[in-house]
Amino acid sequence: MVSQTVVSSLLVVLGAAGVRAQQRQSLWGQCGGSGWSGPTLCVDGAWCNPQNQWYHQCIPGSGPTTAQPQVPTTTARPTTTLVTSVVSSTTSPSGPVVTNPPVNPGTCPNTPSGLGTPVANQLNDPFTFHNGNKVTSKADWACRQREISELLQRYELGTLPPKPSSVTASFSGSTLSISVSEGGKSISFTVSINNRPSGAGPHPAIINFGTFGASLPVPAGVATINFNNDDIAQQQGGSSRGRGKFYDLYGSSHSAGALTAWAWGVSRIVDALELTQAQTGIDPTRLGVTGCSRNGKGAIVAGALEPRIALTLPQESGAGGSGCWRIATWQKNNGQNVQDSTQIVQENVWFSPNFNSYVNNVNQLPFDHHLLAGLIAPRALYVMENVDMEWLGKISTYGCMGIARKQWEALGALDNFGYSQVGGNSHCSFPSSQQGSELNAFIEKFLLKRSGGNTNIFRSTQTHSSFNLNNWSPWAVPSLN
């Protein structure tokens, strides 16, 4: 016979479980995902949207009637041969390609082979070389950028190959066809150029990564270039490592992760636009790049590794994009459900396999993603983040980009940097009422070359009182001349 005490205890447990089951998560709150123990039902007027395996979010509406693919496919376009130009063969240098900033770096110090001294509870000093020397001039900064790029490629991103020996391009209708040859191998891919402005060109354009989350409103006078980045490097989980046209050309065991392969693809698009400017009417010196979520990670890496990009526009890129590994780890250690380095390498193949050796102790890395953003400085960067999606690491992106901003400050270029973190919108749904004027100001200034609008922006609609920017960046900010 079961005692009354046992029955009472069982009823208490069942009652508690029932309360949890009946609890409803508020709008924009988390409602599921791997390891989630909180409410799985949403308040009336919202439904639980599975953003990914680890994070489900309550968003407005009643939900789709049928399952929607998260990463849509792109129909292949026919290749045409209206105009063809060929880049002359060049000797490919060994080692990673580094960003070529506008300042002549002169003779830069060699990058040491070791990781250096671990940095904990703060971010690496942008203005100190790996060997301990200080950055005191813009020429020094150019050398420091080269060093940062090499370190990122060595330990996280994988090697960016040099410009191939041959790039050919042709344009017909709205299709730009690109063929690349290197080492006896060749690949071809296409991009579509849409909304080309009428009238005398050349005109600016924004390269858009994929179609997933492609929600940025592009004003008149700016063309859009749709880039199927999955064609260059797949991102369908761990099994897609080494798959895509980049790896067809360089081998499936190449060290580059998908983000680096996509940046290489963007560089080839720029090459092709330089070759076909008379046919496309696109100005290759006035190019932006954008993407959201996973493709936002690709956008910021492309802006960092390709110096011909004038305006970088990552949207809700979170961890692996505008967020810093160290700050995400700090958030995770404080009980917040954010994506960190240990999880992200399990989800997909965005990074080099080399990165796996460091994800359990990111303090040993000689960089963080404030330095990835710094590879763009003083070129224009406008970062858009979503304060309602905790998985993105709202403190991580706020802190990381707030500290990244100091690099533009040192260069006297704060008008070229923007960070805007708002809420009340679904993941990758652009909140025009809150960020539309900011986005337009950046496009007007850096692509259309017209004045007007504020482009010195650092704001969040939420107060991050638990995080102190200065504590995480205790180093001095020089004035570089």
Swiss-Prot record:
Protein purpose: Glucuronoyl esterase which may play a significant role in biomass degradation, as it is considered to disconnect hemicellulose from lignin through the hydrolysis of the ester bond between 4-O-methyl-D-glucuronic acid residues of glucuronoxylans and aromatic alcohols of lignin.
Cell compartments where the protein resides: Secreted
CBM1 domain boundaries: 23-59
SMART domains assigned: fCBD
Active site: S293 (nucleophile), H427 (proton donor/acceptor)
Keyword Electron transport in record: no
GO molecular function: carboxylic ester hydrolase activity; cellulose binding
Signal peptide residues on this chain, from the entry's feature table: 1-21
Motif (GXSYXG catalytic site motif): 291-296
Entry similarity comment: Belongs to the carbohydrate esterase 15 (CE15) family.
EC number assigned by the record: 3.1.1.117
Domain of life: Eukaryota
Binding site for substrate: K297, Q339, E347, W391
Catalytic function, reaction form: a 4-O-methyl-alpha-D-glucuronosyl ester derivative + H2O = 4-O-methyl-alpha-D-glucuronate derivative + an alcohol + H(+)
GO CC annotation terms, alphabetical: extracellular region
Keywords from the named record: Disulfide bond, Hydrolase, Lignin degradation, Secreted, Serine esterase, Signal
GO biological process: one example: carbohydrate metabolic process
Keyword Transcription tagged: no
Protein's name according to its UniProt entry: 4-O-methyl-glucuronoyl methylesterase
Disulfide bonding pattern of the chain: C108-C143, C292-C428, C324-C400
